[in-house]
């Protein structure tokens, strides 16, 4: 199991992105990705962070590849994503 921290920019408001994020959570959970936290930078609601647990970095990448279109339609600017991986 890994913990991933994803930081990225969005093209819409945080509220709009968050609504789409919540809508897609059942798909993510069914795929084995479990969100621990999400939020935005103070004073900058266009810079978002998501912290999640999943099986492996490869598992997360496969999910992103399969669901990239839905992620982009939420306002997530995919090419802005910076990922940090932690293991225990």
Write out the residue ranges for each language-model feature:
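Short, exposed beta-strand-loop hairpins at the edges of beta-sheets
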Residues: 72-74
